[in-house]
């Protein structure tokens, strides 16, 4: 409490901290509506907190006192770990050099008390791991969440930039992930996750699977817990739209998911596949990977970076239930080889016509004004009225 009282209190609801001790005490004593502002500088990681709970319209906010000079939380097993929290917002921090995870938010292993109403905004997370299943942002048993304008770079070679296990009703928007083409995955939602949108994100060489819809989860980690006699899936009702994916062994992986929509995205030079359809969880009761919808996407590739016609289909899947429509496929070096090997016929697909990208070598994958592909890809995505 001494450190807590030594923190500069501007009012009942704003606390400015400048040391790791002040930060820890302020969070431990946080009440609904408090805003904890970190001065510029470096803070020691390895911070764990439980039951930090704001209230509706009265969240607890942890942020930078000066967003132009974001404080750095460095090191520890995890820079920050929160369990069983609610109405919590974390903004404008830099999280670096943790051994296992940059930011971990979970339900404390008690599946009937999920963390909920979480906002993560303007975070920079980098250099996590570097070996093993280590994540930039790890969410387990989290509901009603937003991850906005975050940048995640270099996570564990067996981990994810953003990993969601048993998470529901969330949106990941305007985030940027950067790594290498063949290390870990980018964004993943598995373990029973549902009703999650991934919107306007940019993934640059973000692992061997840039976006994984579903995955492979130990049965004991599903949230809600699996019940006998019901149909099971790694994930349901996931949507990816307006995203740009550069590189990666596989751009989009449907893995044991029952219902996912991928639309108005731009994929540029995947190293083997634009799409993977896989089933890795094969225990009794699990439905085959099915009901994927892939429409209005722009896929630009090279023939020497293209395997199996750009689509990899594994056993125990139901590729015949997928829908493909209005996608624009272009092979840079051999336009006549632009047609992909899809499991079912595509409706109104376009093959072999140059989309006229603006400046792909410099990372600008928008299209020129005269482009014939103006109506597909990430540049063509417009938020539906329901989201405004």
Task: Annotate each predicted stretch with a short phrase.
Residues 28, 46-51, 77-84, 101-113, ...:
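Glycine-rich beta-solenoid repeat tracts in large extracellular/virion proteins
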Residues 12-49, 371-375:
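Acidic Gly/Asp/Thr-rich repetitive segments characteristic of extracellular carbohydrate-active
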Residues 40, 59, 66-68, 86-97, ...:
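Right-handed parallel beta-helix
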Residues 287-291, 295, 301-388:
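Acidic, glycine- and Ser/Thr-rich low-complexity intrinsically disordered tracts
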Residues 25-29, 74-81, 364-376:
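Short, polar loop/linker segments at the starts of domains and inter-domain junctions
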Residues 14-18, 37-40, 45-46, 53-102, ...:
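Right-handed parallel beta-helix/beta-spiral solenoid domain characteristic of secreted/periplasmic
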Residues 1-3:
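Bacterial N-terminal signal peptides
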């Amino acid at each position: 409490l001494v450190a807590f009282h030594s923190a500069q209190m501007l009012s009942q609801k704003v606390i400015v901290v400048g040391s790791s001790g002040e930060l820890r005490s302020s969070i431990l004593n946080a009440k609904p509506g408090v805003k904890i502002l970190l001065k510029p500088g470096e803070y020691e990681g390895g911070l764990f907190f439980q039951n930090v709970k704001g209230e509706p319209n009265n969240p607890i906010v942890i942020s930078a006192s000066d967003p132009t000079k974001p404080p750095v939380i460095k090191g520890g097993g995890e820079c920050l770990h929160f369990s069983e929290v609610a109405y919590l917002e974390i903004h404008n921090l830099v999280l670096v050099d943790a051994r296992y995870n940059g930011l971990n938010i979970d339900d404390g292993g008690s599946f009937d008390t999920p963390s909920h109403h979480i906002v993560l905004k303007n975070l920079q997370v980098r250099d996590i791991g570097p070996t093993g299943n280590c994540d930039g942002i790890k969410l387990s048993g989290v509901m009603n969440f937003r991850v906005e304008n975050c940048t995640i770079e270099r996570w564990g070679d067996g981990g994810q930039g953003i990993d969601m296990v048993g998470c529901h009703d969330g949106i990941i928007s305007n985030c940027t992930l950067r790594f290498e083409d063949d290390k870990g995955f980018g964004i993943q939602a598995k373990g029973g996750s549902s009703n999650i949108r991934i919107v306007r994100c940019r993934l640059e060489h973000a692992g061997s699977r840039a976006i994984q819809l579903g995955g492979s989860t130990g049965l004991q980690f599903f949230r809600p817990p699996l019940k006998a006699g019901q149909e099971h899936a790694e994930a349901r009702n996931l949507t990816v739209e307006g995203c740009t994916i550069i590189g990666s062994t596989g751009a989009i992986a449907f893995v044991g998911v029952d219902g996912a929509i991928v639309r108005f995205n731009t994929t540029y030079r995947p190293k083997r596949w634009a799409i993977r359809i896989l089933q890795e969880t094969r225990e009794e009761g699990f439905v085959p990977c099915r009901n994927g919808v892939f429409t209005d996407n722009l896929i630009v590739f090279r023939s020497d970076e293209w395997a199996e016609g750009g689509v990899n289909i594994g056993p125990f899947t139901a590729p015949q239930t997928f829908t493909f429509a209005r996608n624009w496929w272009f092979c840079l070096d051999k336009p006549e080889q632009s047609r992909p090997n899809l499991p079912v016929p595509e409706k109104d697909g376009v093959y072999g016509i140059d989309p006229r990208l603006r400046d792909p070598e410099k990372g600008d994958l928008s299209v020129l004004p005269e482009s014939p592909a103006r109506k597909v890809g990430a540049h063509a995505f417009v938020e539906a009225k329901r989201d405004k």
